[in-house]
Structure formats: structure tokens, C-alpha cells
């Protein structure tokens, strides 16, 4: 009886599947697309086979439209990452500048930006 309940809970969709997000709270387009395609493949497999027992055919059913589609998805995800990084760096720069300006009697001989840690390039 316990195993029946366990297998039943594994078959049902979990509400957190649709909410894939990065730690900063913004959903990643590429991951959401992948989650949706995997979910559609799983539902397609389930409806045609009558259950999740035939998961071995799932990998064969899902094929990307073409290599160009895959490249477009990768490029879109990279552009999103670059956009986030640029926004993050701007936010850090603004915070640093506001921190430095909070000391009115201090003048800096260098530009008002933090030095990157050793071993990294900027």
C-alpha cells in the first residue's frame, strides 16, 4: 500500500516545475523552454503509452527542429546572461560611487571603482 501511494505521488506534476528561476529571481528563458519541451514530451509519452513505464522512448521522440533552432536558443540564453551581468555591474558601480561620495572629505587619486580580486581580469 505504501508503494502505491509513492508511485502515485511521483506521477503527478509538482507545482514547482513551472517556476524555474535563477537565484536573483528572474526566470531564465532557456531553462523555461527546456522545461516546457520536456514536460510536453513526457505528456506525449504518457498519453500514447498509457503511463511513464516506457520512458526509454522519450529520448527518441524529442528531436530539435534543426541545428539552427538550437543555436538560436543558446544565443538567446547567452544574450540574457550578458544583459544580466551588465545590469549587475552597473548596480555595483552605482553602489560603490554612492558609498565613496558618502565621505565628503576623502579624495581619491584613482578612479572611483573597486579593484577586481587578484587572479581575475576585468
Curated annotation (Swiss-Prot):
Biased composition (Polar residues): 1-10
Region (Disordered) location: 1-68
Record's compositionally biased regions (Basic and acidic residues): 40-56
InterPro entries: DUF4633 (IPR027990)
Pfam families found in the cross-reference section: DUF4633 (PF15464)
Entry protein name: Uncharacterized protein C11orf86 homolog
Phylogenetic placement of the source organism: Eukaryota, Metazoa, Chordata, Craniata, Vertebrata
